[in-house]
Amino acid sequence: MVTIRLARHGAKKRPFYQIVVADSRNAATGRFIEKVGFFNPTAKGQEEGLRLDLDRVNHWVGQGASVSDRVAKLVKDAQKAA
């Protein structure tokens, strides 16, 4: 099953997440099909905290991909901001 989920990157105590489309059987930070955005929960000031390609997310959801709980909230926030 294809899932849209977060893949953690960054240093210790400085998380940075890529929003990826991946097969649910692969490791969380392993192989992915497509990168559709990023999320920086520690963004301050003028730094960009969230970038999401909503067209590609909607494409994958239309193809039957499931969305993780956290990514669903981020998509909702991005749609509200757009």
Curated annotation (Swiss-Prot):
Which controlled-vocabulary keywords does the entry list?
Answer: Ribonucleoprotein, Ribosomal protein
Instruction: Write down the superkingdom of origin.
Output: Bacteria
Please provide, alphabetically and separated by semicolons, the GO molecular function terms listed in this UniProt record. structural constituent of ribosome
Q: Point out the coiled-coil segments of this chain.
A: none
Q: Which PROSITE patterns match?
A: RIBOSOMAL_S16
> Where is it found, in Gene Ontology cellular component terms?
cytoplasm; small ribosomal subunit
> What family, per the record?
Belongs to the bacterial ribosomal protein bS16 family.
Q: Does the keyword Metal-binding apply?
A: no
Q: What is this protein called?
A: Small ribosomal subunit protein bS16
Which terms under GO biological process does the entry name? translation
The UniProt gene name for this protein comes to rpsP
> Which PANTHER family does the entry mention?
30S RIBOSOMAL PROTEIN S16 (PTHR12919), SMALL RIBOSOMAL SUBUNIT PROTEIN BS16M (PTHR12919:SF20)
